[in-house]
Amino acid sequence: MAQNTTTGIATGATIDVQSRGILPQSALDNTLPLRKLLEELQGQENITLLFAEGTYHFYPDYATECLLCIPNHDEDALKRIAFALLACKNLTIKGENAHLLFHAELLPFYAERCENLTISGLTVDYAQPVYSEATIVSVDEKCMKLAIDPKQYPYQIINGRLFFPCGEKWNPLHRWLEMDEQRNAPVYATHDVCFGEEYGGLTPVCQEEQPGLVTLVLTREEQRFLSTSKAGNRLILRHHLRTHPCFYVSYCQQVHLTDVAVYHASGMAFIAEHTKDIVLERFQVKINPDHPRVFTAAADATHFVYCAGKLQIKHCLFENQLDDPVNIHGIYARIETVCGNDALIVRLVHDQHKGVCMGEKGQRLRVIDNQTMLGYHEAAIESIRALNKDLIEIKLCEPCAQMQAGHVIENLAYIPDVEISHCIFRNNRARGLLLTSAGKVLVEHNVFSVPGAAILIEGDANEWFESGAITDITVQNNLFDNCTYVADWGHAPIQVTPSAMRADGERRYHGKLAIQNNVFHCFDKRVLYARHIESIVFANNQILSTHAFAPIEGATFDLENVLQFTEENNR
């Protein structure tokens, strides 16, 4: 073994972290010894860090600090990081049933420019989640009584409004989601309920009847609680922005997470950007059996922005997170100013995309009409520079006279193939798989039990600015179990709805979609809702009627601007 004379760590070494003072002892802060160890490993290769069984605590006081613009999160700010994995090669972090417990505002894992990174055998949770819970004691249209455990979820009532702790501050309740007592899933026909005039929401007067019992009264004539609310249901009380994902992976190659469980994160459980070849195997976002909260991650289970190579999600369980299980997309930047036929300034429009890199010299861009969502020019980047986190200046190698303000660009260098198989997606807020990748996509042998569209294929150049016209998606041998029971989150179990405002001749934004050999358990007629796609094959599927929920109006196949639709051998 080669040995680094500066650190004394041999290439290929296995390090039991307890030998470095990282110990599974009650409340002991392991952040500083972990930081020192990771700093020693910079420039090293083929290292394994071994975490023996036990609970390891991490606090933000001695953590590494970085300014991060994390895609699809709510703030661009200095983040404290526990596992700062920077430019590592062939690093393995191996847990032997190790539990990592994080405290306060701390980002557990940040990997930047790593190659061949493997993480396994860990569970992750926070000592105090960033959301709270309540149980409905009684409810009518104007008054609701809530039971809140003040030890588990401390609260204050200030000027008649409910507040919860956020670090050293107290944040007001700004929305909640009601969960069915029996199913531990969102209530049928519910929606997010917002609070406060700043959110255009309800403005109840809150009063504590006794410790742990709070009454909310709506005094404005026009305001009502939802008719679907009932005693015994639990409320997820949201009073924190999505700030810290559990795993944030940026500009890496060959990332493999196996046998990892995330019980909570104050953002997404896993997000990767500009990363090639990712495998998530038996990666779980699930309820902690020792602390049975009704929610897990505060946002998506997994999210992939401008990734490449192959993305594999296998044998995973994603449940009870507060947004979609999987979202795969690129980013559209809107043309702000055309500075000639070969130069332009573009804007990152959505607040959660600020600061994201749109490309490098030599990579190819596509220019798209935001009305039809169709591309009309491709060119390599001659030069590119960020003017600030909002605006980017770009010079193209090939000129184009058609470019105009309001149109958008996307980077063609990041188009992953995707395989999602043998997974369970259930009981979360919102939808299932959001798939906008021009690579080859295979979705098979999965179980979907989600309140919105189980599979959503979009592409949007006018609101979220998430790019990715599909070319070839196959959805086969899956079970769709009574999905799309919340109207706000989808029109049908499988939905294709790019933001194109009009068609253009025989061209369509999306390419081919094959839906075959699946089983649909449906409480109404709706199965497929599609717009602006070239070809759909719906074959050899079984559709079974259930009485799980009251039917929602809609056709079995609701299609517009679909060039070719083939239906055969379904029953």
Role assignments for model-derived ranges:
Residues 17-50:
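Acidic Gly/Asp/Thr-rich repetitive segments characteristic of extracellular carbohydrate-active
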Residues 35-42, 57-92, 101-120, 128-144, ...:
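Extracellular beta-strand-rich solenoid/capping regions of secreted or surface-exposed proteins
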Residues 15, 47-49, 83, 91, ...:
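Solenoid scaffold repeats with emphasis on beta-solenoid/beta-helix
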Residues 51, 58, 85, 95, ...:
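Extracellular beta-strand solenoids
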Residues 102-108, 128-132, 244-246, 266-271, ...:
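Short glycine/acidic-rich loop motifs that flank beta-strands on beta-rich extracellular proteins
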Residues 102, 126-127, 151-207, 354-388:
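Ser/Thr/Gly-rich low-complexity blocks that favor extended beta-strand/coil architectures
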